[in-house]
């Protein structure tokens, strides 16, 4: 069954057409359902919008989605709003995956080396009572509390074994390579 997927990406990768390869791979299949995806992402370039308006735009884009797919290019890890989309997806309870997209040619025929994994730069920690989740980001050579989304109460108290421990998102969420892992044929299984 097809999932409503929110794609998170750096806008430069749209300009280079790498994002479009993944988001539009369904057009050569029978339909979006056969590809396993209904795209619920934001196409707008909202660079001139306030922080509050951008958060509202992202939050609205995440509504009615069950999966967040982070398309990893060269600078994705460093983008403030990609980080927000990931952290908000955790709060929402979406399944989260990453996909490296630098292994196929851009519109100029160039291939790039893999970009840094954004999940290496984000993390979380359950409170000692297991009732709250605190979010962190790697910045300035150290882990700091994430400022764009406050700690929040979790729906279900965390098991004692998870309380008070820090987890990098890369230890929790899977990352694939669109080319090496055959994303064209396997994407629907990744999001299910």
UniProtKB/Swiss-Prot annotation:
Organism domain of life: Bacteria
Localization in the cell: Cytoplasm
Description of activity control: Activated upon phage infection.
Short name of any one Pfam family annotated for the protein: ThsB_TIR
GO CC aspect terms: cytoplasm
BP GO annotations: defense response to virus
Enzyme Commission number: 3.2.2.-
Role noted for this protein: TIR-like domain-containing component of the Thoeris antiviral defense system, composed of ThsA and ThsB. Expression of ThsA and ThsB in B.subtilis (strain BEST7003) confers resistance to phages SBSphiC, SBSphiJ and SPO1. Phage infection activates this protein so that 30 to 45 minutes post-infection with phage SPO1 it generates a signal molecule that in turn activates the NAD(+) hydrolase activity of ThsA. The signal is similar to cyclic ADP-D-ribose, but how it differs is unknown.
This protein's domain notes: Has an N-terminal TIR domain and an C-terminal antiparallel beta-sheet.
UniProt name for this protein: Putative cyclic ADP-D-ribose synthase ThsB1
Organism: Bacillus cereus (strain MSX-D12)
Gene: thsB1
């Amino acid at each position: 069954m097809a999932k409503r997927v929110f794609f998170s990406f750096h806008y430069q990768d749209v300009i280079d057409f790498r994002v479009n390869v993944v988001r539009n791979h369904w057009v050569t299949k029978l339909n979006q359902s056969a590809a396993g995806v209904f795209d619920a992402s934001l196409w707008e370039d909202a660079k001139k919008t306030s922080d509050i308006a951008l958060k509202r735009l992202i939050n609205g884009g995440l509504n009615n989605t069950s999966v967040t797919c982070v398309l990893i290019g060269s600078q994705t890890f460093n983008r403030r709003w990609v980080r927000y989309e990931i952290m908000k997806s955790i709060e929402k309870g979406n399944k989260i995956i990453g996909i490296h997209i630098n292994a196929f040619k851009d519109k100029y025929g160039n291939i790039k080396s893999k970009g840094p994994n954004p999940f290496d730069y984000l993390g979380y920690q359950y409170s000692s009572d297991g009732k709250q989740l605190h979010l962190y980001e790697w910045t300035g050579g150290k882990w700091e509390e994430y400022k764009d989304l406050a700690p929040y109460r979790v729906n279900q108290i965390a098991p004692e074994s998870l309380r008070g421990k820090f987890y990098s998102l890369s230890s929790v969420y899977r990352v694939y390579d669109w080319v090496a892992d055959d994303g064209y044929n396997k994407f629907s299984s990744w999001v299910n």
